[in-house]
Amino acid sequence: MTQTLSQLEHHDAFIARHIGPSAPQQVHMLATVGSDSLAGLIAQIVPADIQLAAAPAVGEATTEAQALAELKAIARQNQRYKSFIGMGYSAVVTPPVILRNMLENPGWYTAYTPYQPEVSQGRLEALLNFQQLTLDLTGLDIASASLLDEATAAAEAMALAKRSSKLKQANCFFVADDVHPQTLDVLRTRAGTFGFELVIDKAQAALEHPDLFGVLLQQVGTTGELHDYRALMAELTRRKIISCVAADMLSLVLLAAPGEQGADVVFGSSQRFGVPMGYGGPHAAFFAARDEMKRAMPGRIIGVSRDAAGDTALRMVMQTREQHIRREKANSNICTSQVLLANIAGLYAVYHGPQGLKRIAGRIHRLTTILAQGLHDADLTLRHDRWFDTLTVEVVDKAGVLARANAAGINLRSDIHGAVGITLDETTVREDVQTLWQVVTGAAGTLAIDALDAGCDEVIPPELLRATPILTHEVFNRYHSETEMMRYMHRLERKDLALNQAMIPLGSCTMKLNAAAEMIPITWPEFAELHPFCPPEQAAGYQQMIAQLSRWLIQLTGYDALCMQPNSGAQGEYAGLLAIRRYHESRNQGERHICLIPSSAHGTNPASAQMAGMSVTVVACDKNGNIDLHDLRAKAEQAGEQLSCIMVTYPSTHGVYEETIREVCQIVHQYGGQVYLDGANMNAQVGITSPGYIGADVSHLNLHKTFCIPHGGGGPGMGPIGVKAHLAPFVPGHLVVELDGVLTRQGAVSAAPFGSASILPISWMYIRMMGAEGLKQASQVAILNANYIATRLQQAYPVLYTGRAGRVAHECILDIRPLKEATGISEMDIAKRLIDYGFHAPTMSFPVAGTLMVEPTESESQLELDRFIDAMLAIRAEIQQVADGVWPASDNPLVNAPYTQRELAGEWRHPYDRQIAAFPAGYGDKYWPAVKRLDDVYGDRNLFCACVPLSDY
């Protein structure tokens, strides 16, 4: 029969591009698991009382081309003014070699957090470059890589100061009043939940306030004044008060390092190192501190270690500080954040080198000084006499100045009483300075730039200029031609294993396809170039896209409202718990502070709860991995009027749909608590059920899991929160940007009003191309894929937890403990051996020690699933060889895995041959790790977190 035009138009073509198993493959897989249809399989697995009766109203699927055309039309509604607003955001030039070879390269943006260092040496080296950049510019001893944004880094600095303070009774944190307003906003929020007293005053008044544990200063104030805080910080040190300094990363190329001036903690945004403003993000924050604070620092730290062969290798160090291990006692709830952006910033420094960076910073500063002199000669008053790149100009007719600016297509900072602010940047040229002078003065003449340049004096005193060299390491002085830079980045990429080479079956991580069509819009200048504090009418396209995406997510979650501000899943948890706290306080029930958390929960949950000022009570799980309802009732009753909420993940972290989830919600509500449903496993809910329908009050969504934003090697992410109507007034708002009906008046949790807005087009594209039916199919196939793996592997590796009919949800936990007890082969050995088969390991020892948690997602075809299954079965056969005594327990292919090319070329002394070691899956498409198994203990005992000679790699 002839196909109809509608069929030939194939509007739902993308669904089959995104979902890995073809229709025939799905039939085969369903037969393998013993089901006759996807619908029948879901009916066996998902409790009937929570299944949706109707599809969410998110529209039908469309093609990649049509979705791109629709989004392009929306993007064109954004007006591309030149923004000289400053306030921590500046226009940049992203080097095309970095744009093409990193930001647009799936070998970089689809990788996961480098928990498996053997398959992550490339991005670990890039992150070490970022840390070295941070160390050189700040003048401090230890740096992390990296944090979410400058404002949240300020909050982390405040918390670090409290943890590190020797003044244990002190509870007051002082903040200079010329810190960026969005930073003040986030600090107020965080201080409130921590119970700190926050004092905001002139910096000179800091010493007048008693009971201080820390002080936050901004080296170049928000209105542009360059400060000399040396004497103040010396006195603070004498009084054992910790000095935290917010710094502009590019300014530090010219200015004296704050660490050399007495600062204990230095932080800021690395956005100016090649990362577009993107209407607020994503951008990586840098963070550095003194050596004695290292074990209290937030965020991931990359260190130099060695592998089993004694060769130099890199890894994340001091992981026992982090939320996935220390839970409510963690330094922070932050997981790896903004790695892709930190890598861009680090490679920007590698590409330009110290001389190139000095040229860029020097040009910006010189143009600023020329403009300042021109304005001074026009009898205008400048608020400050020392600056780097920002001027505050007093004007009589402010409205007239702003009108001329608007007519010229430029934005000035307008929130300063009686003045306008002007911040120059890397893109500023002579013509811009000319236009700015005309706009501010109202004069029609021209500015004699060369004459002013010849006559201008340096406004920065010598004692505030940098005297120590920066970026002397060879990595910053070698790759300045595009050819060399391209090859260096490719060498780093080849060391890593990302989704462009193999499935990454990490449980609880949802490493699904990040389609090219979804990624294309993030580099469109209409999205990339907007300042987050530009006039709202200039961001009409962003507002429409965000509003539409919010409506879709509300439909998919069953909630009434959505807040797009949290720029990570951890931030979403904090924001959701904060909404619960504010809600209770609004009802005069501020005593409700107990958060119930199942023992199976991810460590971020208790870490977020303590950050929100709550105390954690653990609820037991039964032998089947489900929440123990008897224990829940007892704990809820015991908490009584102090019960704030429960944090629960669904499907559970054990990989099953708990039949009693609605009863869990009812019990908590009965005692006056709220239900926080963690959205980590939303990929098994979309289109099938929803948190709101289940009975939850608030959830965060990991857009970097369920909705296709790539993991980027450890960020960026987005963690918007959906809430029921009664919590809607209590979600984060923003001090700087006021949008009635869109943003509340509550305090912020992130620097920008819509978090990392420039990556939201990825999720918009995914939902638009999939439509309601495609989204449901994605969830169904994710569940099918997990059950296919569980069915085929359960004889070799027991599946620890199953639900009804022996089924799992979208992930399964393989129990390695019996094998370890019998043979000594551990989950670690299996994880490392999988590298030789060309796979990234599943999640190790979470949520149960001695297990592997596997989540294949819907994007993997049967061919790739079979390749993984075959690898796991082959490894099981290898374990049997150890059990049978064919290979010694101390010298076999597993305990020595993985194998490098160097090792194969050397002397071979093992009781198995090289082919078994390095080519267990054959010779085709072989992935070679750059290093052997890491020596974790050595790396933590011999802490070294800066660049080593390139010859060591």
Swiss-Prot record:
It is an enzyme of class 1 (oxidoreductase). The modification N6-(pyridoxal phosphate)lysine is found at K705. It catalyses: N(6)-[(R)-lipoyl]-L-lysyl-[glycine-cleavage complex H protein] + glycine + H(+) = N(6)-[(R)-S(8)-aminomethyldihydrolipoyl]-L-lysyl-[glycine-cleavage complex H protein] + CO2. One of its GO terms (molecular function) is glycine binding. Its cofactor is pyridoxal 5'-phosphate. Its EC number is 1.4.4.2. Pfam families: GcvP2_C, GDC-P. Keywords: Oxidoreductase, Pyridoxal phosphate. The keyword NADP does not apply. Coiled coil: none annotated. One of its GO terms (biological process) is glycine decarboxylation via glycine cleavage system. One of its GO terms (cellular component) is glycine cleavage complex. InterPro entries: GcvP (IPR003437), GDC-P_C (IPR049316), GDC-P_N (IPR049315), GDC_P (IPR020581), PyrdxlP-dep_Trfase (IPR015424), PyrdxlP-dep_Trfase_major (IPR015421), PyrdxlP-dep_Trfase_small (IPR015422). Belongs to the GcvP family. The glycine cleavage system catalyzes the degradation of glycine. The P protein binds the alpha-amino group of glycine through its pyridoxal phosphate cofactor; CO(2) is released and the remaining methylamine moiety is then transferred to the lipoamide cofactor of the H protein. The glycine cleavage system is composed of four proteins: P, T, L and H. This is Glycine dehydrogenase (decarboxylating). The lineage of its organism: Bacteria, Pseudomonadati, Pseudomonadota, Gammaproteobacteria, Enterobacterales.
